[in-house]
Each structure stands twice: as C-alpha cells, then as structure tokens.
C-alpha cells in the first residue's frame, strides 16, 4: 500500500466512525497533539471527534537522511475522540485490518507507556502499540492538557505513518518507501531533510533564535490578555519551535532548558484557560442540549 493510500484509507475508516477529517495545521509543531484540534478541543465538556494527518518537526532527531528510520520531519496520523468510546481498542485493530494488517496473523501488543508533554502541560495514561516488535502507534487517555483536567476523558490514537508504511511495503528504510507508484519518499523529502538538518545543526543563528523566542513570548502574552486564543496558541507553538532549534544547536544549558520549558508551559496553560473561558461564554455550543 502506497504512503498516500495509507492516509486516504485512515481518513475513510475514521470518517465512517464519525470523525471530522481535518487538514494539518499551518505552523511548525513537534507532534500532532499541538494542533488546536487536539490541544484545545481535548479540554472542556464539549464532545469532539477528529482525525487528520500531521507533519511534525523535531530538529534534534535529524540525521541528514543517513538514518533509515529517524528524521527531523515526519508524519503522524492523529485521532481524537471525546468522550472515549467503548471498545476503542477493537476499533483501532479494525483500522489496522482496513490497512491490510490482520491482527490474527501478527503479534500485536499493547505495552504500558504513559505519555507526557512538559511544554504543553499535558499528560495521559496509555500504551505503545507494537506490531511484530515495532512500535507503530501511541494510545493515550488524556488526563490533562494545558494543566487543565480533561473531563470527559478523550482518547488520542497517534499512528506512526512511516513505520506502518515500512511494515506494509516491507522496507528497511523510510527513504525507500513508495509515496505512490512513481515517486519515492526520498524523491520528495530527502533534499528537504538535508537542508533542514544543515539549518538545525549548523546554520541557524542562536542569538536570533533567542530574540525570536522573546518576541513570540511577548506576543503570546499580549494575545492571551485579549482572550485571542487561536493566535496566542500560534505564538506558543513558535516559542516551542525556537526552543527546539536552540536545543538542536546545543546552546541550552540544563538550567536554561528548565526555564524555557516552564515559560512555554505557562503560556500553554494560559491559552488553555482562555479557551475554556471563551467556550463557556458561548455556553459550550457543542454540548447537546
């Protein structure tokens, strides 16, 4: 199954399960959880079901395309359902069957692995899903986002698209994956990966990154004061990416790291609080009356 067909099939499956099918969010982020369709919608009383593919950037993970299964840019497929439905594990296994992976023919294990994002003030309990010894999915019942308790509890299912594609296509390297019948993953992303790694590790200007972080932090604070939740979150995500770029350059001390994380977490918490306040003023419109 081609890479693009995996996304299309997951869209079809989760659409039939009642999920909105959304598009990626248009700013750099380290995980699909940072998309407002997850980070904001996971909190508050309103029900929410959404699925989407999300490109993610983690600058420190770059290897100039030399590592067969590690890159600074990759794709997740994100599913959020709130409240979490019964038999969600069975639905997930059925989604694998929809991709051509019969659970009866493979060793599929749910390995306990609780999840945490310090910068988002988010955590949850759940499992890694292993398929014949390779992790392919993270399964998490969110407990908090932005430091706010989740009630009702949402389920997050995060598929690692490259790993699933490697399994389906029997490939040893993400760079050999077939995006479609004519174009490989490397034809699209290898030059991008090399360029971005050069920037991440050698050519970004740390002093400018520090200045940008301060500017983005100031902008986020200003927007939070005005209860402009969405643009405020945009600037929190920009702060997070600046921090990740500084980390990739190796210019952050242990003390600085803790301070940067706390600054981002504080902003994320205030954005989440602002979101709840906005939705409450709207009488939580998605709650069924």
Swiss-Prot record:
Enzyme Commission number(s): 6.1.1.14
Places the protein is found: Cytoplasm
Enzyme class: ligase
GO molecular function, one term: ATP binding
Main location: cytoplasm
Source species, domain of life: Bacteria
Keyword Repeat: no
Reaction catalyzed: tRNA(Gly) + glycine + ATP = glycyl-tRNA(Gly) + AMP + diphosphate
GO CC field: cytosol
A Pfam family hit: tRNA-synt_2e
GO biological process, one term: glycyl-tRNA aminoacylation
Alphabetized UniProt keyword annotations: Aminoacyl-tRNA synthetase, ATP-binding, Cytoplasm, Ligase, Nucleotide-binding, Protein biosynthesis
Keyword hit for Nucleotide-binding: yes
Summary of subunit composition and partner proteins: Tetramer of two alpha and two beta subunits.
Family of this protein: Belongs to the class-II aminoacyl-tRNA synthetase family.
The protein's name in its UniProt record: Glycine--tRNA ligase alpha subunit
Organism: Prochlorococcus marinus subsp. pastoris (strain CCMP1986 / NIES-2087 / MED4)
């Amino acid at each position: 199954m081609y890479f693009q067909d995996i996304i299309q099939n997951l869209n079809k499956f989760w659409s039939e399960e009642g999920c909105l099918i959304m598009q990626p969010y248009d700013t750099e982020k380290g995980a699909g959880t940072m998309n407002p369709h997850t980070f904001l919608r996971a909190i508050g009383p309103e029900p929410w079901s959404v699925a989407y593919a999300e490109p993610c950037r983690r600058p420190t993970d770059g290897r100039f395309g030399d590592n067969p299964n590690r890159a600074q840019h990759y794709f997740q497929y994100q599913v959020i359902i709130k409240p979490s439905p019964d038999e969600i594990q069975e639905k997930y296994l059925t989604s694998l069957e929809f991709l051509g992976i019969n659970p009866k023919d493979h060793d599929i294990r749910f390995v306990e692995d609780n999840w945490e994002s310090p910068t988002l003030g988010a955590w949850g309990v759940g499992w890694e899903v292993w398929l014949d010894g390779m992790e392919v999915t993270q399964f998490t019942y969110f407990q908090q986002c932005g430091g706010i308790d989740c009630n009702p509890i949402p389920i997050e299912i995060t598929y690692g698209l490259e790993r699933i594609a490697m399994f389906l296509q029997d490939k040893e390297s993400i760079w050999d994956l077939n995006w479609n019948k004519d174009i490989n993953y490397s034809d699209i992303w290898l030059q991008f990966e090399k360029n971005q790694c050069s920037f991440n590790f050698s050519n970004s200007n740390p002093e400018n990154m520090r200045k940008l972080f301060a500017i983005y932090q100031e902008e986020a604070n200003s927007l939070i004061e005005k209860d402009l939740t969405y643009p405020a979150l945009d600037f929190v995500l920009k702060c997070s990416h600046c921090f990740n770029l500084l980390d990739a350059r190796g210019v952050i001390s242990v003390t600085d790291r803790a301070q940067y994380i706390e600054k981002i977490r504080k902003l994320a918490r205030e954005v989440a609080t602002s979101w709840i306040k906005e939705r409450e003023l709207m009488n939580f419109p998605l709650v069924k009356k």
